[in-house]
Amino acid sequence: MSAARQLTVTPLNDWGFFRLPPRPCVIAGPCSAESEEQVMTTAEGLKAFGINVFRAGIWKPRTHPGSFEGVGAPGLKWMQKVKKEYGMRICTEVAGEKHVFECLKYGVDMVWLGARTTANPFLVQEIAEALRDTDIPVLVKNPVNPDLDLWIGAFERLNREGITKIGAIHRGVSTTEKIKYRNAPEWDMAVELRARCPELPIFADPSHMAGKREYLQELSQRAMDLGLDGLMVESHCDPSCALSDAAQQLVPPDLQALLESLVVRDASSADEKFRDELSRLRAQIDVIDENLVFDLATRMKVSRKIGEVKKQHSVAIIQAGRWDEVLEKAVASARQYGLDEEFVKTVYNAIHEASVAEQNG
């Protein structure tokens, strides 16, 4: 784990949008603003159960040309109407300085950078400079690939331009593996971001992780279990007619039901008995962790010696048969102890990679 990074961040409660506790802070609205009627009807449905921050895509960076790419600036007038009639804060995605200037012109309260934009430092810098001397919050989605440093770099660029109302949106990452979700949740990325930037508010975007509405509840609950601050969820008055991402959008009443189903646990407890028990268990974990590191160090020493012996006898470092045997034994042990087999494989593959590096050294 890398060292914590020092960002200057205005606390979420000082943005004027949200109030913590309770969690989650919620941003909701359609994937895309499609018509005035659709925007207003959706906003009315969301406002009815207390949603105060309304999102809608105005410009849509689509994978294929010719797909619906958003209505553009005219949609900002509909957003403006939402703000005026329902008293909701409004936010949308920006991908360049032109978008920023249009948003400022129409009184948009908050903007976010999409995953593709975050992956391009030139665009991030352009947007940061366009937002200089403004006071609107900026949320940043993680890049499409699991690159935490690239994500943190976007916050640093915003900070350098004096922007301190910043927050993260974790939307999962692209994967070539066949999984049930649209994007791999990669929760470790959000956990590591919190460790390195503890002051940064983090929202989850279960809509883009899921790809299908049937998975939204489980992903939202997981975000709460991990202590994330909020959710950005796509909601449409009639998803069957949506021009983009129809399968992952909820009608407002279903979003209300989802939010009411979430179990949100406290970050700590004042109960002395609880604290004593937790301290005792954590002390056990500390000892186990120390032993783990000692055993890993010992294993690496043995790996180095094996490497030396192989070099002396001109034997190749990697011997697939031996590694298959080691992994098979580890998986069998995992099964015996009730451990997740994929987890054990991941750990052993990381150890194997480090061992090969030691032997090559």
Positions of predicted regions on the chain:
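Catalytic alpha/beta core domains of metabolic enzymes, predominantly
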Residues: 19, 123-257, 261, 266, ...
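Glycine-rich, proline-tolerant flexible connector loops at the mouths of alpha/beta enzymes
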Residues: 55-74, 237-246, 306-315
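N-terminal amphipathic alpha-helix/helix-capping segment at the start of soluble metabolic enzymes
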Residues: 1-27
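Hydrophobic faces of well-ordered beta-strands that scaffold small-molecule active sites
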Residues: 24-30, 52-56, 90-92, 111-113, ...
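Catalytic domains of carbohydrate-active enzymes, especially glycoside hydrolases
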Residues: 41-58, 106
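N-terminal active-site wall of soluble small-molecule enzyme domains
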Residues: 56, 61-111, 121-122
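Domain-level signature for soluble enzymes in the chorismate/prephenate branch of the shikimate pathway
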Residues: 267-361
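Active-site mouth loops of central-metabolism enzymes
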Residues: 24-41, 65-69, 88-94, 114-115, ...
